[in-house]
């Protein structure tokens, strides 16, 4: 009791002494006047640093003992907190950041029922994935010497604009059409390729100076933003919680896009920003958003920020970026609304009205229309990541619907590596004098990227063997992350089987997988459990997985913009990277190579474009082994299909049991609505396909496509020669009958 009364008296003296001051004093103002209030708190030490008692000392002596001994026998001063640890580098360099987390549903009751086919198990039963296929390869020392010689050759063989015969005139070659696949309007670039659109970008009309002056903010604002260089995040006047979150991520200096956009974002102005891949665009819009949310009303829960992305994986990644940056901001909440994940779980999350909602367009509209307690009336900021993709035809209808749902008075931020600045496509977004910030020249690859090209000529059948050869050459130990891009998901799946039979474990990522399988593939690749990931253009945008050393373009993309997004998965954030592209003889392939070489020649960065030489004799030997797997591959596909059918039947059985068990609850749920009818969705899909392929929309074509849709894409009946003969005979009979009637009528008329 005496101790507590002394402490109260000391506090009163300290308060009365500083009562007349106009400022709040700190300890450094007068260290002598700081009352000693913690004399009685010396016993509150942690369990790790318990004092070692000596038998000859009394309680009084123990209190006055200035030194204690911890469990390790080390002396510790009593006035120091034993749990305190000095952070020598201020958290700037000692980060253990290993990349963003890709976490889907947190399922509480996850039953043990098998949900996916074990493809690796099937391949293993057929003799694959055991030992790496051994094709006659030189010894390790000779390999290293060859690699060194090859690198020297590559440096000498830098491609010029006429490389690969780029100056030769060739007839346009038709590429095979890919199957249509509309999986939640995601980034599945599998439609028909048309070589005639290789010069589309050159033919596209450019905005006039008058149009740009009336639409954009004054050029002075943009130039001032890009010319102002911030050496640290402290100079951006950010709050301490945000700075602490950035420090934990290892962010020490803002990138050019962050330095330019953060001050404008904090001021509430609209932004249209573009920068090369891996330059930190996600943090560039997330930092000012979180900083502004520090000043939100504490007691009113409402959704204030919407972030739209074209793919589910990108949305999950952005949510993790935001959570890590806002880790120390109290009361900041995030919500996720993406397709493929648990709908009810997302509804419960959105009922709490999180501050920031990251979503894909389709699922966002679904929740706004059908989820109770979730509304967007208080939205203040709309962000569109990969905005050029979001403005394309595939998302147009949904984007227009979203813009009608959101308040017109809002801040809009558009970000992309290949930002389309056409004013015509931006008018629908209701932007208010947006500030246009383009850090790098448009359509430029990241710095420190080495772009290699392998000329295939007429050896398309050797591409799987070439892929195996390159992966072994670039990473024989399986310690590098390699991404392989293909045009079609069927090819991605087939390559996984082929490489598995050759003893190489790889993953796949495309729209035919469930969302759980997709996230599992990304996480396995991130943890190097699977060092090679074969994917479609679903993964070409936004995904930031650390230390991807190599990108291989197994199939050439259909445009240079998609090529930039693909190779942008490596050489991120100032790191070195390498891309290897298989180049065919089509004019489209040549056009993309020309654009890449031109970009390298015009840039002042350290990237380069070279021709890669390969051992075709060794690749042909590997191809013989691949061709011998023909029947085995078919057997694996058949067995996989059978297992899928069994799993599907089990799922339907379980679904039926649940419908019987929870019949009343299911029937009591209101029917979910959509802003388009089935007929409208079908017409929009057809028009979208026709416009993408640059074909005229006429009624005959539309009716044929609608008939195909109604018949589940089954082929319409085509007349045979026999049918034509029958039709001709029938028409001739009708003509004879008609002529006979005419002659009879004529005779009757003459008699009269």
UniProtKB/Swiss-Prot annotation:
Keywords: ATP-binding, Coiled coil, Helicase, Hydrolase, Nucleotide-binding, Nucleus, Ribosome biogenesis, RNA-binding
Alphabetical GO biological process terms: ribosomal large subunit assembly; rRNA processing
Catalyzed reactions: ATP + H2O = ADP + phosphate + H(+)
Compartments, as annotated in UniProt: Nucleus, Nucleolus
Gene symbol of the encoding locus: DRS1
Originating species: Vanderwaltozyma polyspora (strain ATCC 22028 / DSM 70294 / BCRC 21397 / CBS 2163 / NBRC 10782 / NRRL Y-8283 / UCD 57-17)
Highest taxon listed in the record's lineage: Eukaryota
Predominant location category: nucleus
Compositional bias of kind Basic residues: 695-704, 733-752
Helicase ATP-binding domain residues: 262-437
Record InterPro entries: DEAD/DEAH_box_helicase_dom, DEAD_box_RNA_helicase, Helicase_ATP-bd, Helicase_C-like, P-loop_NTPase, RNA-helicase_DEAD-box_CS, RNA_helicase_DEAD_Q_motif
Binding site residues for ATP: 275-282
PROSITE patterns attached to this UniProt entry: DEAD_ATP_HELICASE (PS00039), HELICASE_ATP_BIND_1 (PS51192), HELICASE_CTER (PS51194), Q_MOTIF (PS51195)
Described function: ATP-binding RNA helicase involved in ribosome assembly.
Record EC number: 3.6.4.13
Protein name as it appears in the record: ATP-dependent RNA helicase DRS1
